[in-house]
């Protein structure tokens, strides 16, 4: 598959270059002609780039919020975006290793290659978890640099915003003052939301869960949930009957309350566990924009907290009640 892509994409590059002056993915009205064209790998990064860059940037995400970041389908339109981009922001920790290197190899855009000012790895400030001692593909789809799903933890989202600002300032120092002012205003709003979420999520402290994939380790650590196992016996590997039987025993013995799965995973195995044990199941997006109500990073985080609370039958505080709690602290 990789060899096929490498043969095909250079032909598409020629097409991209030949139509560079015609309407396309980056075609915009004349007033926007001088905007910094930014591509991100996920919607969360696009949202933050938009908040920090504002009217100075035009930003597009390759992945949709409903997609599995480990297996993004290859499309010629992605190559066109990268060919015309001024900057590229990636998640990092090898999240995009299965598809982004081929796109970068073939896009013929030196501005966004690793090491160039236009390439930003957004994991720079993140402390990774689950870093394997000796990475081995026999252990499944492991990430040598650690778990890449750090975006689910809003504290990491805050750090990511700072890294995005660093990248924009480094590539476009003439606009650094505006980027930094926008970041400061964004972080003020972020901190207010983070305080709200800490109160909203208090009932999640100590709740024991099983996840489908290791997508929720950072979220769980931040809000006090205990991840007791995964439906996948190894990352990216489908469960065997023996593994499912083991999970059933664990659910009963350890009083595990909830299964968390993503939209793009099959309902087959969570449904089996629910039917056999009565455990509750919640389906969540692990990127913003996966559903209409999760457009924007703030909505994404809040949706996941409230969805888990409701799945557990716990009460969701109103904004007025949260404000009262904040005032009492």
Predicted regions and their residues:
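Bacterial N-terminal signal peptides
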Residues: 9-22
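N-terminal secretory signal peptides that target proteins for export/translocation
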Residues: 1-5
């Amino acid at each position: 598959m990789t060899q096929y892509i490498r043969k095909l994409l250079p032909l598409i590059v020629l097409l991209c270059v030949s139509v560079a002056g015609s309407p396309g993915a980056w075609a915009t009205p004349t007033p926007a002609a001088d905007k910094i064209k930014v591509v991100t790998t996920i919607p969360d990064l696009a949202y933050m780039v938009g908040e920090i860059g504002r009217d100075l940037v035009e930003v597009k995400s390759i992945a949709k919020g409903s997609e599995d970041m480990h297996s993004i389908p290859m499309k010629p339109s992605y190559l066109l975006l990268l060919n015309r981009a001024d900057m590229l922001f990636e998640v990092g920790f090898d999240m995009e290793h299965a598809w982004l290197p081929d796109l970068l190899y073939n896009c013929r855009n030196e501005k966004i290659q690793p090491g160039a000012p236009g390439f930003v790895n957004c994991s720079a400030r993140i402390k990774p978890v689950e870093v394997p001692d000796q990475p081995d593909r026999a252990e499944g789809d492991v990430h040598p640099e650690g778990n890449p799903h750090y975006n689910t933890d809003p504290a990491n989202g805050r750090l990511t915003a700072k890294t995005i600002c660093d990248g924009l300032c480094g590539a476009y120092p003439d606009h650094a003052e505006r980027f930094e002012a926008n970041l400061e205003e964004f972080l003020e709003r972020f901190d207010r939301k983070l305080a709200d979420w800490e109160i909203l999520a208090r009932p999640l402290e100590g709740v024991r869960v099983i996840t489908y994939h290791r997508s929720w380790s950072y979220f769980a650590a931040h809000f006090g949930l205990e991840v007791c196992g995964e439906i996948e016996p190894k990352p990216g590997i489908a469960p065997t009957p023996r593994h499912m039987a083991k999970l059933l025993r664990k659910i009963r013995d350890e009083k595990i309350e909830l299964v968390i799965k993503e939209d793009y995973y099959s309902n087959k195995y969570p449904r089996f566990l629910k039917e056999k044990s009565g455990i509750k199941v919640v389906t969540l997006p692990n990127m913003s924009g996966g559903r209409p109500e999760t457009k924007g990073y703030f909505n994404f985080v809040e949706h996941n907290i409230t969805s888990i609370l409701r799945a557990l039958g716990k009460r969701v505080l109103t904004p007025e009640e949260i404000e009262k709690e904040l005032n009492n602290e």
